[in-house]
């Protein structure tokens, strides 16, 4: 998905790497994100990353790692511009700048009024992010192993040395040896009865790491996106 592709772009200039993906990269659930990505560009009205950070921490009920939130909100501005330079076709204002719209929870001046902060590409922002990142990876010569499902990690003397993967098309098992491994496997929404997550989000990555005793953090905070309403099992709820 988006996180794995972006990690590959960051690492590619410094090392030989490969992306192992259960799906074709542009079929990731990142493509389900429609509304936009928030960054305090101030293209429509006054804005700054401090207000963005305030809204994010408040939206987390003050449970978020606040220094990490500051980094996220501050660097979001350059990240959006970077995606634009890589070719992401953002929607535009009449003056040619990246369009921004209101989105839930975002305000100016720490709650004074709603903020125009979400940068978007019509109603397919996530899809265009995936396409842009994948094209950037291809242009950088990143190697892809599409439709390979990771089954386990290879650990020698407490050090991760690679992964074991199943080639879906042939049923063959492969061992990939590496000096460093990054997991960016997305969520696990399909363990829940009601979820809008893609059927591929089965928690493979977190499950593998948990079985190896690798600590996982903040696992109780899980978001379904797009959101859903949980209805009662009454037959009348199925009526139009």
How should each PLM-predicted stretch be described?
Residues 30, 63-69, 80-100, 215-218:
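A short alpha-helix-loop-beta-strand transition element characteristic
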Residues 230-240:
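Single conserved hydrophobic/aromatic residue that forms the stacking wall/gate
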Residues 39-71:
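Glycine-rich active-site loop/strand segments that organize a redox cofactor
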Residues 84-172, 177, 184, 228-229:
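Conserved redox-cofactor binding core of oxidoreductases
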């Amino acid at each position: 998905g988006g996180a794995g592709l972006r990690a590959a772009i960051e690492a590619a200039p410094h090392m030989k790497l490969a992306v192992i993906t259960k799906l074709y990269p542009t079929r990731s659930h990142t493509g389900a994100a429609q509304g936009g990505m928030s960054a305090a560009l101030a293209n429509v009205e006054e804005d700054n990353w401090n207000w963005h950070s305030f809204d994010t921490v408040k939206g987390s009920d003050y449970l978020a790692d606040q220094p990490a939130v500051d980094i996220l909100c501050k660097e979001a501005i350059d990240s959006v511009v970077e995606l634009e330079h890589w070719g992401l076709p953002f929607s535009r204002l009449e003056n040619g700048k990246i369009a921004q719209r209101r989105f839930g929870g975002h305000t100016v001046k720490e709650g004074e009024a709603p903020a125009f902060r979400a940068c978007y590409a019509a109603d397919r922002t996530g899809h265009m992010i995936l396409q842009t990142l994948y094209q950037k990876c291809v242009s950088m010569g990143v190697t892809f192993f599409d439709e390979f499902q990771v089954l386990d990690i290879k650990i020698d003397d407490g050090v991760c040395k690679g992964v074991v993967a199943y080639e879906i098309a042939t049923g063959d098992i492969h061992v990939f040896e590496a000096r460093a491994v990054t997991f960016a496997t997305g969520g696990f929404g399909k363990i829940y009865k009601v979820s809008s997550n893609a059927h591929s989000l089965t928690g493979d990555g977190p499950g593998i790491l948990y079985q190896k005793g690798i600590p996982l953090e903040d696992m109780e905070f899980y978001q379904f996106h797009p959101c859903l309403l949980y209805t009662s099992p009454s037959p009348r709820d199925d009526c139009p």
